[in-house]
Regions:
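N-terminal export leaders
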Residues: 8-18
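Metal-centered catalytic cores of metalloenzymes
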Residues: 2-7, 20-21, 25-84, 88-149
């Protein structure tokens, strides 16, 4: 039995192919982006402190370019923030050096940076944290580990 494609069949097939190809880039781009969140507190510092300030962070890593973009807000600090940045590589409970500084220590802070392949791998492995420092807590007042969402 040999089937001859009808005009309706061709139109349906064309519509299906166009629909698939128009959504394919969306599927790829979603797979190329990793989203992170963090909740910052004094209890997460190493060693922990009794500061009552809090913060929240959202970040996205474009895995094809290693570009990290972020937005962080914080309130209730003992005084003005003196520094704010990402640290790594370190798992929760450990400390590490500064990996990427924030462009400002005034909340809210938005920024972007292109990471090295090693930095991106550490971030994806859960080995980065955000830290906000004050004069009262120069080693860090609030901290939050970046968690893959």
């Amino acid at each position: 039995m040999h089937l001859i494609p009808t005009p309706l069949f061709r139109r349906t097939l064309l519509t299906a192919v166009l629909a698939w190809t128009s959504t394919a880039p969306l599927i790829v781009s979603a797979a190329d982006t990793a989203t992170f969140t963090a909740t910052l507190s004094g209890a997460a510092e190493v060693p922990a402190n009794t500061a009552v300030g809090t913060g929240s962070l959202e970040a996205k890593l474009d895995k094809s370019t290693n570009q990290l973009t972020w937005s962080v807000t914080f309130i209730g600090l003992t005084g003005p923030a003196t520094m704010a940045h990402f640290h790594g590589p370190a798992m929760p409970g450990a400390n590490a050096g500064v990996a990427v500084p924030f462009p400002s220590a005034v909340s809210p802070v938005e920024g972007k940076a292109t990471l090295t392949p090693a930095q991106a791998a550490d971030l994806l492995a859960g080995k980065w944290y955000a830290n906000v420092h004050t004069a009262a807590n120069p080693g860090g007042e609030i901290r939050g580990q970046l968690m893959l969402k």
